[in-house]
């Protein structure tokens, strides 16, 4: 049975992402994991960080790869398939590499359930749009939006992976102490890992040039931007010798 594109769920999902991002800005609070776990109410169950990250990121990978598997196989298929492969690559890393290497604190079960629901919904939205709704001209591969967007995606993913590596090296296995991250973009901002992922999804939005992708990029900017802001405050309060010239998210600006 051939699946056709229905714009209503695509627009509804995109509007939901944009609304969630706006609510994050209005509430002005960070998500309660990692450095901000102390804000979680007592009695809330926790999951080991590695298990939580693996299970919550897995749906986006499974959904995107599952939809790709049903498409005709070729080295360079329709642009939508190639773009969905980039989306899948991000979640492959998050699911099978990042989750196994992370040394983070236990993850609140409530936040885990929310993150899992988000990954299911967003994975379905992005994959459904790119496979069944997206229409690109034959010359899209040479369009500046595609080429620059893919460049930003790869650049952002590289920054994110390198920054995560830097953070892991600050802590020996079993340690729960915090140290000042240095090197790379941490020279300029406290949330280098967040900045990398924001750049990544802005690049994805440019390359896809779609409402769902821009909605996802907006949500990412709001969510990770808020995390970066509170991470910066955390470092300033904890370390008296924290670099005063370092910003929260955007070098020299914010």
Curated annotation (Swiss-Prot):
Spell out the activity-pH relationship: Optimally active at acidic pHs.
Q: Which family does it belong to?
A: Belongs to the steroid 5-alpha reductase family.
The record's annotation in Pfam families points to: Steroid_dh
What is the superkingdom listed in this entry's lineage? Eukaryota
| PANTHER family for this protein | 3-OXO-5-ALPHA-STEROID 4-DEHYDROGENASE, 3-OXO-5-ALPHA-STEROID 4-DEHYDROGENASE 2
This entry's Enzyme Commission designation comes to 1.3.1.22
Q: What is this protein called?
A: 3-oxo-5-alpha-steroid 4-dehydrogenase 2
Q: What is its EC class?
A: oxidoreductase
Q: Which GO terms describe its molecular function?
A: 3-oxo-5-alpha-steroid 4-dehydrogenase (NADP+) activity; 3-oxo-5-alpha-steroid 4-dehydrogenase activity; amide binding; testosterone dehydrogenase [NAD(P)+] activity
Q: What role is this protein assigned?
A: Converts testosterone (T) into 5-alpha-dihydrotestosterone (DHT) and progesterone or corticosterone into their corresponding 5-alpha-3-oxosteroids. It plays a central role in sexual differentiation and androgen physiology.
Record keywords: Differentiation, Endoplasmic reticulum, Lipid metabolism, Membrane, Microsome, NADP, Oxidoreductase, Sexual differentiation, Transmembrane, Transmembrane helix
**Endoplasmic reticulum as a keyword?**
yes
Quickly give the catalysed reaction.
Answer: a 3-oxo-5alpha-steroid + NADP(+) = a 3-oxo-Delta(4)-steroid + NADPH + H(+); 17beta-hydroxy-5alpha-androstan-3-one + NADP(+) = testosterone + NADPH + H(+); 5alpha-pregnane-3,20-dione + NADP(+) = progesterone + NADPH + H(+)
């Amino acid at each position: 049975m051939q699946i056709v594109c229905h714009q209503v769920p695509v627009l509804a999902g995109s509007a939901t992402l944009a609304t969630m991002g706006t609510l994050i800005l209005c509430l002005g609070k960070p998500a309660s994991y990692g450095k901000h776990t102390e804000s979680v109410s007592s009695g809330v169950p926790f999951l080991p960080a590695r298990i939580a990250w693996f299970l919550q990121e897995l749906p986006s990978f499974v959904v995107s790869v599952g939809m790709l598997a049903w498409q005709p196989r070729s080295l360079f298929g329709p642009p939508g398939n190639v773009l969905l492969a980039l989306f899948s690559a991000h979640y492959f890393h998050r699911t099978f590499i990042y989750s196994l290497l992370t040394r983070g604190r236990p993850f609140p079960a409530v936040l885990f359930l929310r993150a899992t629901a988000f990954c299911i919904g967003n994975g379905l939205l992005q994959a459904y749009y790119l496979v069944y709704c997206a229409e690109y001209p034959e010359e899209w591969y040479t369009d500046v939006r595609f080429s620059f967007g893919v460049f930003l995606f790869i650049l952002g993913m590289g920054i994110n992976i390198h920054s995560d590596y830097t953070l892991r090296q600050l802590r020996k296995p079993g340690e729960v102490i915090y140290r000042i991250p240095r090197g790379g973009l941490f020279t300029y901002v406290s949330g280098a890992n967040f900045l990398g992922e924001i750049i990544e999804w802005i690049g994805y939005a440019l390359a896809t040039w779609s409402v769902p992708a821009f909605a996802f990029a907006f949500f990412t900017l709001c969510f990770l931007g808020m995390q970066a802001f509170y991470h910066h405050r955390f470092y300033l309060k904890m370390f008296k010798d924290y670099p005063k010239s370092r910003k929260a998210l955007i070098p020299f600006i914010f």
